[in-house]
Amino acid sequence: VNLSYRQQVARNHTATHLMHKALQVVLGESAKQAGSLVNAQGLRFDFSYPKAMIKEQLEKVEQIVNEKILENIPVVTHDKVEIEKAKNMGAMAMFGEKYDEHVRVLQVDNFSLELCGGTHVQASGEIGTFKIISEGSVTSGVRRIEAITGTKVLEYIKGINETMTQASNELKCSRNEIVAKITALKDKIKSQEQSVTALQSKLAQNKLSDLLANSTQVKDIQIVIENLNEISVSELEILCDK
């Protein structure tokens, strides 16, 4: 087995346990696992919750997990524990797992206690760091979080830095000025669009005057026959409104 691959899977697996508990701390104990996927690329965790998590909640979950990582807590496994004893200890069961009469219990200090037979790190510090990438809906009442750990977080940050550098170069400003620059450009575009709309309205009014001057009166109805191919759709809409 590739050691690097196994190590990254272990990071993501232990991080899944930490995040599960962190979700319950932030959202309440009703936030229970509804499915999960762990591989070397990252982790995916489905859990019961009736609505989208807000930014502050996601940040708090991230903070809790990273604090536990920095504490470098020993990750202890208790083998061949009777299933009833494990439940009495308060161990949470992972979704979709079938348990024998004797089970393996994974403990991260007094923070996380779950039944699990997978590969894990020996101490939380081995995870390195933890980053939530996305949070969304799977189905009614079930949310999904995707996250990364270890070297994948470094790759993620590198990608963001490259994008920021490219944006600052294109906008000809420092990174700290990017948001202000974009806001200024949006305001400028909005102002120009308003000017264009005003000009189109004025042109349409002039065109309307010309059309009415060349109209034909049939009883009480003014009839205008004109080829308007040179007029844009937006100008034509303004003209019709007149």
Indicate residue ranges for each PLM-predicted region.
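Active/ligand-binding-proximal structured segments within catalytic/core domains
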Residues: 1-47
